[in-house]
Design a protein with these regions (language model features):
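Short, acidic loop-to-helix structural element flanking the phosphoryl-transfer center
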Residues: 108-136, 144
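Non-catalytic pre-domain segments flanking phosphatase-related domains
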Residues: 16-80, 255
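Conserved small/polar residues in nucleotide/adenosyl-binding loops
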Residues: 238-243
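Conserved Lys-Pro-Asp/Glu-containing loop-to-beta segment of HAD-superfamily phosphomonoesterases
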Residues: 179, 183-206
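Bacterial Sec-dependent N-terminal signal peptides
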Residues: 1-24
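Active-site neighborhood of HAD-like aspartate-dependent phosphohydrolases
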Residues: 86-117
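Substrate-recognition/cap helix-loop segment adjacent to the acidic, metal-dependent catalytic center
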Residues: 131, 142-168
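Asp-based phosphoryl-transfer active-site loop
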Residues: 78-88
Length: 255
């Protein structure tokens, strides 16, 4: 009966006007209920796990555009975005809809609750990376005031942070750490060979200027890196774009 009820709600919503609230509700139902959401996430992380061992072994390979030479002797690292890449914020999205509000209302409060769950496939990927001796870095556009809560949330899910380095790089943690993640990727590239990057927004892989360019320019840029996608770059895609996005209005993502 629950499945039938969901289908009836979903079909009924198709007849509604395309309001922001309607789009948000459709996306929330999709993420909460659908096999497609689960299979998309698991599929991407399974593919990433298949590729990771060989990338670790190939000392002459880097996944970072910021890293052009002198990296072969550096230890391997992976970079992951957090929101809708590692942590699932669908409960926050549902809360917005229930209260008739829009992002960023209540965003900081939600993060400080430390209740987000892993996206499907994340836990297994992080375990594999650790077993291969790969350092894990999280580069997020959550703001610096949310660092402790974000760290706590990840630790509650079982991730163990190093006591010797900063693996959680927040927006605004340093003056130069803006919405553009380039400087943070460069900082990691100074000491590590970046073998893989995982995100849910083009800006998790390229500069902010490229990410905020025209649709045609963004598409051309994406095509320029065909050999990276599905090899060392993995992008999770959801039907609901993040409100934080400059080009689309989607579920909170750290892009």
């Amino acid at each position: 009966m629950k499945t039938n009820a969901f289908v009836l709600i979903f079909i009924s919503l198709l007849a509604l006007p395309e309001t922001k609230g309607h789009q948000g509700l459709m996306a929330t139902l999709f993420v909460q209920k659908s096999a497609e959401f689960y299979s998309n996430s698991i599929g991407i992380y399974n593919s990433a796990m298949d590729k990771l061992p060989a990338l670790v072994e190939d000392k002459n390979y880097t996944a970072a555009l910021e890293q052009t030479s002198g990296f072969s002797g550096k230890p391997p690292a992976v970079i992951l975005d957090i929101d809708q890449t590692v942590l699932d914020n669908i409960a926050y999205q549902a809360r917005l809809i229930e209260n008739g509000r829009y992002y960023p209302d209540g965003w900081d409060a939600w993060c400080m609750e430390e209740k987000a769950y892993y996206i499907p496939g994340v836990e297994e990927f992080l375990a594999l990376a650790t077993s291969l001796g790969v350092e894990v870095f999280f580069v997020t556009n959550r703001t610096a005031n949310l660092e402790e809560a974000t760290r706590n949330n990840l630790e509650k899910l079982g991730f163990s942070f190093s006591t010797k380095l900063d693996q959680l790089l927040m927006k605004g943690e340093k003056p130069e750490w803006t919405s553009d993640k380039t400087s943070r990727r460069q900082l990691i590239a100074d000491d590590y060979r970046i073998v893989m990057m995982i995100g849910d927004n083009f800006g998790d892989f390229v500069s902010l200027d490229v990410n905020r360019s025209s649709t045609e320019q963004r598409n051309n840029a994406a095509k320029a890196y065909n050999e990276m996608w599905g090899h060392s770059w993995f992008c999770l895609l959801y039907t609901s774009p993040s409100p934080r996005d400059a080009t689309l209005s989607r579920m909170p993502s750290s892009a």
